[in-house]
Amino acid sequence: MPSRREQILDTAARLFAERGFHGVSVVELGAACGISGPALYKHFESKDAMLAEMLVEISEELLRVGRERSTTAGSARAALEALVAWHVDFALAHKPLIVVQDRDWQSLPLEAREKVRETQRKYVDVWVKVLRSLHP
């Protein structure tokens, strides 16, 4: 069962995907979670902190599993197939997060934005390495 913190992040991702990060108030988010808006601050420092955690985590998970899939595959072709399957499965299973990452990442505080971009570059590098091994 997901922790309360995970439940809040899931609800926030859904609402941010529907209305945008700036289109959701803390009061609305709290109500959707079944708590008061101010009660959210027991779990997160701010709404920005929620966005940062969800987007840093999604980027880190993509990188971690992408590296794992590409390095445990038996060949470059198998690595590419594993990466494609992983990325598509992840995107389909986490549609709200993908929308938020695409649309709202610029709303992140600078430090989190840099962390997300750095992690995304590393994830792209995983793909580049596999593709270059197939087509040098």
Map each language-model feature to its residues.
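Short, structured motif recognition centered on aromatic/hydrophobic residues
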Residues: A13-F16, L62-L63, L80, V84, ...
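Short coil/turn segments at alpha/beta junctions that flank glycine-rich nucleotide-binding fingerprints
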Residues: E18-H22, A73, H94
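Helix-turn-helix
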Residues: R4-Q7, T11-A49, E53
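Alpha-helical transmembrane segments of multi-pass integral membrane proteins
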Residues: A52-V56, A85, R117
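Amphipathic alpha-helical interface segments
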Residues: T11-L15, W86, F90, H94
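Amphipathic alpha-helical segments used for helix-helix packing
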Residues: L92-E111
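Amphipathic alpha-helical linker/stalk segments
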Residues: M54-A82, W127
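Amphipathic alpha-helical packing segments from all-alpha helical-bundle domains
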Residues: L63, L110-H135
